[in-house]
């Protein structure tokens, strides 16, 4: 007796239909192309080999109480340049009796966890009761220059020329000593004949190199005394006070000149010292000061200005019973590109009240790892391009964009059944897939024509079923990826130009950045919708091809025992080919001809420039689908007589 045996697609109400370009799919399950990720609080780095830290006892592995005294792991401590009791500002000014450490090192990303050792608790005077405002200005300049440099170093001995009549001086309010920078020089005068002394003229040189460190820019403390009135300074009738720094061309670059600037007008009778932070290029500079007193720059921090990179500043405060300042916090928040790590609770140490805080350890634990994105909101190492909430800038790396979960396209999963057809739901997408409205002029927009996706599918369409070839879909992936790269590059240029135009308005930059991010998210979701449709169509075609491959294999196995009368259907004589024979042909010796479908291997990798500020996302698309490995599920063997 002859019977007809066919491969038949079986789809029931549990399947959902997914439309694609060139073919559709029925599937038992579906999943979002990406899940939303949540940033982890604290600090991390993009690359373990390209960062360096600057710290104090809380990162100092030579501390006798390490690791209990530390807020970082042993691995992270190895990345820090630290000394117990030290701070960048202490090394800059060198107050008597304090730790003086040579801070220097190189790294694209710099993490600063120091500053607490110069705080109100330190009670440093030297003609200034409160140094917090100077510390704020110092830290801000350090963060700014560090973000533009690969290497930085303290220069702890500048070449100088001091006038013969000046000798090193001391001050009673500075432990009967004085700062190492600036150094105090005084003139010995003999009233009444030489009651005023001579004007001071001194020179110092900022080097182009310090050891192995190149110096293209120096941070210098321009210090001078502030008198409340001329009478306070001019008790001997010696004219007005001045202390001025000049560059080699004679231009004033720092200091104070009471010959042209008014005194404070306050009622005090003791001068205070002010130190302005100035950024100077290498070269020879002169210092002129009124007789009797000279404050001479003797140190600087030098920067090579060779590479832009992230800066992370970690809140540096004492535990209970010690007074702290928040200069580090304020300096970082007012410096573009600086990410601030802050505690939510008071500092509570394990080794003592001031060392080994558990909350800070958790916030800094991310320094042991590499992240895909670091930002003020935290760090992310998942590959998803979407997060539930907008990540606060600054941010660097491949940072996810804010999106709603329901807006992320879904792709078919589980049991997949192909069906011919053309997607009718996405043939008219939005007229452009990227845009940040009319604020940005001249951006490249990708137009989507009504007939399809405007040249992305380059192959010829099959007349039967209206689908596209596998090759054309693959070319579509390549072309859409290339076009989006061009789009992102053009956007980069436009954004950078706009940033330059409105750089004076920080709020405008923040507003524009948020708008751009929202547009990027919408654009990416639109792009993913197109990619999803391409994926569905490509898989559908591939599965149908696999069906024909399966039918061909059955025909080959059957030989003369079965005659293929149409694709997927055979006539067989069961008097000649019994059940075991049929099992051999159609079930491969009782082995199911339809093994479980492997997981859909799709990857969409979003890439960006190494750093967030002024950059634009780039989109690299790979859709690696092993068509040869996909075997049709949901196929039944149907017998009819």
Curated annotation (Swiss-Prot):
Query: What Gene3D superfamilies does the entry give?
Result: 2.20.70.20, 3.90.20.10
Q: Sites of glycosylation?
A: 12, 47, 130, 381
Q: Which GO terms describe its molecular function?
A: host cell surface receptor binding; sialate 4-O-acetylesterase activity; sialate 9-O-acetylesterase activity
- The annotated region (Esterase domain-2) lies at 297-351
- Positions of the UniProt region annotated as Fusion domain-2: 352-637
Taxonomically, which superkingdom? Answer: Viruses
The record's Gene Ontology biological-process terms are: fusion of virus membrane with host endosome membrane; fusion of virus membrane with host plasma membrane; symbiont entry into host cell; virion attachment to host cell
Write out the annotated subcellular location: Virion membrane; Host cell membrane
EC number, as in UniProt: 3.1.1.53
Q: Which UniProt keywords apply?
A: Disulfide bond, Fusion of virus membrane with host endosomal membrane, Fusion of virus membrane with host membrane, Glycoprotein, Hemagglutinin, Host cell membrane, Host membrane, Host-virus interaction, Hydrolase, Membrane, Transmembrane, Transmembrane helix, Viral attachment to host cell, Viral envelope protein, Viral penetration into host cytoplasm, Virion, Virus entry into host cell
Q: Name one GO cellular component term.
A: membrane
Q: What class of enzyme is it?
A: hydrolase
SUPFAM superfamilies to which the protein is assigned, alphabetical: Influenza hemagglutinin (stalk), SGNH hydrolase, Viral protein domain
Query: Post-translational modification, briefly?
Result: In natural infection, inactive HEF is matured into HEF1 and HEF2 outside the cell by one or more trypsin-like, arginine-specific endoprotease.
List the residue ranges of the region (Esterase domain-1). 27-137
From the record, give the transmembrane residue ranges.
Answer: 617-637
Name the family.
Belongs to the influenza type C/coronaviruses hemagglutinin-esterase family.
Q: How does it assemble?
A: Homotrimer of disulfide-linked HEF1-HEF2.
Entry function: Binds to the N-acetyl-9-O-acetylneuraminic acid residues on the cell surface, bringing about the attachment of the virus particle to the cell. Plays a major role in the determination of host range restriction and virulence. Class I viral fusion protein. Responsible for penetration of the virus into the cell cytoplasm by mediating the fusion of the membrane of the endocytosed virus particle with the endosomal membrane. Low pH in endosomes induce an irreversible conformational change in HEF2, releasing the fusion hydrophobic peptide. Several trimers are required to form a competent fusion pore.
The protein here is known as Hemagglutinin-esterase-fusion glycoprotein
Tell me what organism the protein belongs to.
Influenza C virus (strain C/Kyoto/41/1982)
Taxonomic lineage is: Viruses, Riboviria, Orthornavirae, Negarnaviricota, Polyploviricotina
**What gene is this protein translated from?**
HE
